[in-house]
Amino acid sequence: MHERSKPKTTGADQTCLEEEKETRGGLRNGSSSDTGGRERTDRGVSCSRRKNCEGQNLEPIGERDDQSSDDDPLLCDERSTIGRHGNADERPHQELAEGGIRMPGRGWWRGKMGNGVWYDFTRHGRGEDDAEGAENNATQQDADVCSGCKFESPREFRKGHRRCSSSTSGILLDREDGASGVPEVSFKERMEAEKKKLKELDDKIYKLRRRLRKMEYKKMGINREIDKLEDSVQ
């Protein structure tokens, strides 16, 4: 009998398989405490989120150790900047050199923005590190309703999208239920914005024409002076 070739598994799949084995082992040993139940639930959610994001062709970029600090050189290189906001106790967001945002948490998923820029996004779990600051950072509700880790460009700000309140670069979370606080830009408002841009362009053109006219007068005056000098020399 020929042995079937085993399918290739990603790092996320391997982690899920290991967690499932640990869960089964815990059930066989009869560990049914509160803490164990919560851990198993969180692991199940974590694996399902990974599969969901992999289905959207997003790139899993690793798993973070809970004991690692926010300034870990593995997470943030020398060119990156750390922006703090709110209370000093809140974990800072790490702004990557390539223009992305990495939020603290256990799992990161990389999604491509509508403007072609890659951003890293963390789904907040129910661990110790985000038990206190979940409401102040990207809230648990926002993280849960983020459907398939989809991202939109801040320029495509339309109804049904909610801006992540803790994001320093304005990442938009794709919400299926629609956000009450996000008004849809009307046709009239868009027309007014376009008219304003046209008016600004007209003003710039007018100023440039005035400068050009002054330069032409100056050139004519210089030419007259040259003619006078030539006449006097002759």
Curated annotation (Swiss-Prot):
GO terms for cellular component: host cell cytoplasm; host cell nucleus; virion component. Its main location: virion. Residues 183-234 form a coiled coil. It is found in: Virion; Host cytoplasm; Host nucleus. Keywords: Coiled coil, Host cytoplasm, Host nucleus, Virion. Residues 1-103 are annotated as: Disordered. The keyword Coiled coil applies. Residues 76-96 have a biased composition (Basic and acidic residues). May play a role in virus replication, from virus entry and uncoating to assembly and budding of the virus particle. Interaction of viral NEP with M1-Hsc70 is thought to promote nuclear export of the viral encapsidated genomes. Interacts with host HSC70. This is Matrix protein 1.
